[in-house]
Structures are given as C-alpha cells and as structure tokens.
C-alpha cells in the first residue's frame, strides 16, 4: 500500500498446518442510555416563556398550573428503549505442508437504543496458501461483507433544510408541553405551527440501507534463484451502498425540497469498482559478509484504477394521506424531480517504488525508500 514512510505490508490471519479445526464463538449484550441531558420541567419552561413576553402558556397567575402537568421527555421516547447486540462467529482452519486454509463467517445483529434503528451484518473471509512446487507458491484471500441498516442511525435527516433541526438535537430542545393556544411564538426552529416533535418525525420517517463489499486478492511468488523472489499480485473490489428513504407528512414540514407537509421519497445508489496490480522483485541476503550484515532490496511497480458512480431519484408532493408504505408502493403518485447522476472519471495511478534495508551487526539499521 502507498504510505508516507514507504511500503506498508498488511497481512491477514492465515491457516496453519495440522488437522482441521473448527471454532465457534457467540455473545449477547444489552445497552441502555446511562444518563440523559437534564431539561426544563413544564413549569420552568412555561415561566421562561412568560419572561420572554409570551402568553401562550397563560398569565402569570396561572403558571402554577404547570407544576402539576407531566411533560414529555423526548430523549426517553427516542432513546429510552433497551437495545441488544448478538454476535456469532465460526472459523475453520487447517491444512498440510503445501496447502493451508482459513475460512471464517461472522454475523452481528443489533437492536439500537434509538427508536426504529438497528443493523445486521454478515462477513465471510477466506485465505488460502499453496506451495505449487519448490519454486512457486500461490496465495489467495477474499472478503465479502453485507450490511443492512434500519432507521436514521444517529438522527441524520437529509430532508431537513437545516442540520440544526435534526431529530437528535430536538430531543433536548423541544418544548416539554404544548402551548395553550396550540401555536407558539417561539423561534421558527421550534415553532409547533410549522414543525413536528422528534417522536412524530422519527415515526413518520422510513430509512433503509444496504451495503455490500467484496474484495479478492491473488498473489504468485516465484523464487528462480537463491535470495531472489518475484511476486505478482492482482486485486479486485466492488461495493455498493443503496439507501431508500421516505418522509411522511409529519417529517416534511421543513423540507429542503419544498412541498412542505407532503410525503417525499428518495432513492440513492452508490457504486465503486476498483482493481490493482503490483509486481515486485526482492533480493534478501541474511549472510552478507559471512553473516555479519543483512540486506533487503525491493523494487517494483504498481498500477490501479477506481471509479465511482452515483444515482439519485427523488419524488415529492405525494398526497398527505399516504402512509410510508403507500409511498414506497406507489412512487409514480408523486412528482418526480430531475434525476441526479454522476459517473466520475476513472482514477488511474501508475507508480514505481523501491526500498533498501541494511542491518549492520544486528545493531544499526539504514533504510532508503523511493516511490
């Protein structure tokens, strides 16, 4: 890999010679918010509004009524549930002197503390090392990962015209009780006449993500002479990130797309393809000057290519009576905005590199790198 300090070699877990071994691990955990941010009581909030000159919560003589009113704790409503996490892992390894393998599968499943949020992830890893003869060896490693995410995952709501109006921020900022008049003279960001409380917004928002990634690498090592090794490796990767999101009428009161109060839907498709080829020649002599010194010289070249593709489809102005499922099932019932697409130019890199390590008497080390 490219690095500021030269060539960096990254290795993964390999198999070992011996009988086939199967290992299985499982764990279960629970999570819950340990401490919430302290917010105003209904009385404190009503009194604060009165001091600001608002009469939406009654006259001064009526403010004591709010002492007996139980306000809503939006932090508890949004983050109050008990989450859990389950993990499973199975690994198979073994091999002979000339063939070693290591294959693993893991599954993570989480119900998050945030209402409507969670994820599931599956990973498959494989690594194989084979000695074809005394001059040639082959190694292969592959990895596949598939992830499903539900919910806003931290409160991000890309439909909002202002990031400050996120669900997370408003669990702390939102008024604990509604004004007597049903409307409020608060600032626009917290105005109940144009906004919806965090619980309404999160229950009227649907977000589902799928992420898939696969990477494969194969390498061939050839040792034609003593102390000299030639290695050629090739890697290929492909991944996508798909997001489906629907905002119901309670989640579009401050939409950046306009059409406030009308359901909206957006589909985002991200894709990346990449490949890499590297060829290196290494000279390694541990018995230089009758074993006093050790020299390692590596030269090589690498080229790689990567390309990103993004597509976004958005539809707005669905009937206000539509539920989230009805929007997903009838996307043609809305008004389609112009499609957004971006096919980036391929990013191609060709490079040459070299490294020299010289050890003197196992005490002094000199290193030279160039790329």
What is the meaning of each model-derived region?
Residues 1-6, 30, 71-83:
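Periplasmic N-terminal accessory/gating domains of Gram-negative outer-membrane beta-barrel systems
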Residues 1-25, 85-87, 100, 106-108:
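A beta-strand signature from Gram-negative outer-membrane beta-barrel systems
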Residues 12, 90-94, 126-130, 218-222, ...:
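Residues on the lipid-exposed face of transmembrane beta-strands in outer-membrane beta-barrel proteins
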Residues 17, 85, 96-97, 133, ...:
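Outer-membrane beta-barrel channels and translocator barrels
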Residues 17-72, 112-117, 123, 127-215, ...:
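Surface-exposed loop/interface segments of Gram-negative outer-membrane beta-barrel transport/assembly proteins
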Residues 26, 105-111, 366-371:
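Transmembrane beta-strand segments that form the barrel wall of outer-membrane beta-barrel proteins
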Residues 98-101, 135-138, 227-230, 289, ...:
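Repeated loop/turn-to-beta-strand initiation elements of outer-membrane beta-barrel proteins
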Residues 233, 300, 349, 353-359, ...:
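Exposed, low-structure sequence patches enriched in small/polar residues
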């Amino acid at each position: 890999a490219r690095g500021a300090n030269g060539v960096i070699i990254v290795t993964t877990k390999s198999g070992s010679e011996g009988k086939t071994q199967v290992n299985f691990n499982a764990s279960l955990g629970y999570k819950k918010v340990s401490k919430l941010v302290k917010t105003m009581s209904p009385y404190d909030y009503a009194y604060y509004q009165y001091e600001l000159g608002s009469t939406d919560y009654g006259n001064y003589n009526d403010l004591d009524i709010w002492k007996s009113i139980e306000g809503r704790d939006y932090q508890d409503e949004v983050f109050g549930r008990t989450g859990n996490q389950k993990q499973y892992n199975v690994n198979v390894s073994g091999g002979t002197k000339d063939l070693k393998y290591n294959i693993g599968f893991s599954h993570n499943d989480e119900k998050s503390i945030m209402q409507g949020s969670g994820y599931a992830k599956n990973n498959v890893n494989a690594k194989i090392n084979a000695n074809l003869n005394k001059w040639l060896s082959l190694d292969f490693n592959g990895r596949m990962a598939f992830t499903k995410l539900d919910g806003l995952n931290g409160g991000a709501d890309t439909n909002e015209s202002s990031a400050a109006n996120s669900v997370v921020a408003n669990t702390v900022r939102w008024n604990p009780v509604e004004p007597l008049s049903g409307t409020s003279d608060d600032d626009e960001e917290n105005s109940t006449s144009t906004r919806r409380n965090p619980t309404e917004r999160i229950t009227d928002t649907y977000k589902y993500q799928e992420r898939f990634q696969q990477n494969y690498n194969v390498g061939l090592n050839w040792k034609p002479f003593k102390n000299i090794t030639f290695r050629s490796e090739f890697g290929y990767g492909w991944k996508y990130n798909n997001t489906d999101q629907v905002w119901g009428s309670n989640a579009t009161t401050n939409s950046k797309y306009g059409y406030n109060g009308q359901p909206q839907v957006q589909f985002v498709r991200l894709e990346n393809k990449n490949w890499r080829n590297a060829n290196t020649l290494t000279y390694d002599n541990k018995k230089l000057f009758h074993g006093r010194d050790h020299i390692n010289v590596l030269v090589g070249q690498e080229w790689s290519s990567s390309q990103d593709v993004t597509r976004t489809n958005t539809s707005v102005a669905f009937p206000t009576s539509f539920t989230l499922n009805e929007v997903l099932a009838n996307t043609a019932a809305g008004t389609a905005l112009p499609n957004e697409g971006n096919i980036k130019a391929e990013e191609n890199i060709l490079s040459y590199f070299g490294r020299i390590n010289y050890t003197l008497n196992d005490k002094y080390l000199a290193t030279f790198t160039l790329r």
